[in-house]
Amino acid sequence: MTQILFTAGVDLSAFIGGKLPCIHGSGRSGSSDIMTCEACEFVDTFLKLYPDIAVLLNIDADHLDYFGTVENIIKSFHRFAQLTSKAVIYNGSDANTCKAMEGITGKECITFGKTADCDYYPANIRHVSGLETHFQLMHRGKELGEIVLHVAGEHNVLNATAAAAAAMYVGVSFADVAKGLAEFRGAGRRFEKKGEVGSITLVDDYAHHPTELTATLKAAMAMPFRKVWAVFQPFTFSRTAMLPRVELQMPQTVLGRNTEE
């Protein structure tokens, strides 16, 4: 979203989690009245925000050391959606997010997702080569045009669809949306290519939750590498201990030692 608005010439303010090359960091102060903020639900921090527009990508069993149950997370997201004044753009393909949106009124509710029953959805997804993915962006059955991404993974196709929906809601043209997404090369520690040694490519990714790990590994294994090795460092012991036991599909795994706790 930040990349799209910046490319479209909006002098926005931004406060995001990863370092974004186009703004030379994770934040900037602009002259317009538009600000993008990557909100976090941990300890209900995002309930201190009162956004005009909220984008809900998904809801998963995360931060269980604070919330205790997924139901409590869903309730927190419901409260966040209620705090939003104009529009909530949410993942209509995610059951937990849909549950959080039940009973939300007084604002426009717009869905994005994997299938045609959502307002915005991708069609004809093609993984061209390496990090490049093409798809057609659809809006309520109508094709808006082609999107070209230079970031890996099916999850980023949905992220791009959500960003496009939000940008067009605030008046950005499809042409500027497509241009901004084509110029997006990822953020720091989000499948970030660090370099190459011989035939080995080193990628750094912040993923430490099972769903994030699965998405990242699927993206890596869809690329033309002969073998994928995952070196995993739990984020913190307390948080990792609260996560459910899951099986991750990865060819090779080396467990990294956590030094934070």
Language-model region placement:
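Phosphate-binding loop of NTP-binding sites
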Residues: 1-92, 96-108, 161, 168-170, ...
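Beta-strand->loop->alpha-helix junctions that form or flank phosphate-binding loops
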Residues: 14-18, 92, 106-129, 148-154, ...
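Generic structural signal for helix capping and beta-alpha/helix-loop junctions
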Residues: 22-23, 97-98, 119, 184, ...
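A structural signal for short hydrophobic beta-strand segments in well-ordered beta-sheet cores
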Residues: 27, 122-125, 191-194
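Well-ordered beta-strand scaffold positions
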Residues: 32-34, 40, 125, 140-142, ...
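Short, flexible loop/turn motifs enriched in small residues
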Residues: 48-49, 127-131
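Nucleotide phosphate-binding/pyrophosphate-handling subdomain across enzymes
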Residues: 53, 130-131, 135, 139-256
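Short internal beta-strands
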Residues: 87-92, 229-232, 255-261
